[in-house]
Amino acid sequence: MKIAVLADLHLTDNFQTVKMPVLNWALQEIARRQCDLICCIGDLTAQGSDKQTAEILEKLNSSKVRFCSTPGNAELRIYGDGKNAVKFDVPAPEGMPVVLIDTAKDEPTAEELSKLAALPDNGGFLLATHNPVRNWSSQAQEAAKLAMQRGAVTALIAGHSHHDEADILRGLDPDKASGGVPMFSIMEQLPDGAWQRSDVTMPGVDPGEWSAAEREDFFRNIGISTMWEEIAALEFACKHNIRHVELRMGLEYASELPQAIEKWRKCCGETLSLHLPDLKLNDEENKLQKFADLAYKLGCDRVTLHVPKVTAAEFENVKEKLLERFGNDLQILLENNVVIGIENLHTTSNARTFETRNFGCNIEECRMWVELLRERFGNEKIGFHLDIGHCRNNAPISGRENLSDWYSCMGDLVNGWHLHQVEHKNGEFFNHRPLSGFYDKLISLGGLFMAQRAGQLKKAPMFLEARTWEGNVEAYCKLKDLFNK
């Protein structure tokens, strides 16, 4: 008896992302391995929209392998009344030793727990649920414990947390799966009734499976942000042959900076970028223009500039003024064909609505602004600078626009990147933490790797942008080790 367990794909309404190939691979692999049943344990959709629900169920119903299912919390995001979540409540076929417990609202109801009490002693069932049993209330955990003590349940499997443990699988999401590439588990019941788990991982995603030339081609795009340590950063770049450097600095700088830049250029330098201050309606100190002049003076090949510092609600009424100021303040860069990367922003805990959040937190607004700038100034050097941390720490937008959506929808405009991790601590999210691996929480680079290999992304400098220079050194050394394995 082989049961394939699928969890946590988070498919959005965009079926052109790399998540669809993940689902197709999983279903094909399950059929190839001749599994007896597919067991879906929640969050196969990103929000439980009509479109997402219909697509997932059509895929499952088209499979040659029967399926059972229980919803996850994501299936309730749009329809909290369970309109679509209930469609994922599909009991296991008769004779299959699987009991599904609905934990879409985190805690199982008394009715759900009664399923455990009804199981026969020594039945050897697999308890499959979305929210891990250890997260249940003590009373609910006791019900599961009793079922296991009498042999009614002999194995547990859950998802939700996007990482692997004995009774938890990280799941299918290439943007969120922590600890490795997209995967599913096969739970096989042995003749003695015990269960044995084996994990099946998606091939071709991890750089360790790429050719040496492909790894080198990707890694050569990795650069660093100086984070107010320009001289030390340029020396580090020379030592490690880092081709792309972004200056994060003030208007005043050390007298030896031009010489340090020249030395780096002769050593290995290809792309020098400068992070500019915000484009604002009122800039009495002409700060943006001064930084644009500095970029030209230092010989920068490109600059990074956030989307305008206005709310989403304000934008339509002030966009002409913003376009005019952009042209005036960045005139020297536009005239000299310097690449300009427009960077996305993110919501904050007290600014998440259209009326309060900054413009340029979603895909539509970012694309519109880049295209407006290109049309106004007739300049294809203006493109999109994709900050993956800003995409991830972007509630509630991040629920419907995952990283893979940004790759799919903005990849053709990309001319630069910011790479950093997001940390969740004490109920808050913090940006600009150093990357410590390919598959961290809360950002996994699996989707980025897949999108690059699928041809969705233009090659461009990828600047590591931790909060501190030391953090960027740490991240660079870690990534270098991983790519050289």
Question: Which sequence ranges carry the predicted segments?
Answer:
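Active-site acidic/histidine proton-transfer and metal-coordination neighborhood
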Residues: 120-121, 281-383, 393
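Active-site neighborhood of phospho(di)ester-bond hydrolases with catalytic His/Asp-centered motifs
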Residues: 5-7, 37-43, 66-73, 101, ...
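Histidine-acidic metal/acid-base catalytic patches
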Residues: 205-223, 230-238, 289, 293-301, ...
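Metal-dependent catalytic neighborhoods of phosphoester/phosphodiester hydrolases
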Residues: 17, 42-61, 76-87, 136-142, ...
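Conserved catalytic scaffold of divalent metal-dependent phosphoesterases
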Residues: 9-11, 81-139
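N-terminal pre-domain/capping segments
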Residues: 15, 19, 209-301, 485
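Conserved beta-sheet core of the metallophosphoesterase superfamily
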Residues: 58, 137-195
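N-terminal active-site segment of His-dependent metallophosphoesterases
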Residues: 1-54
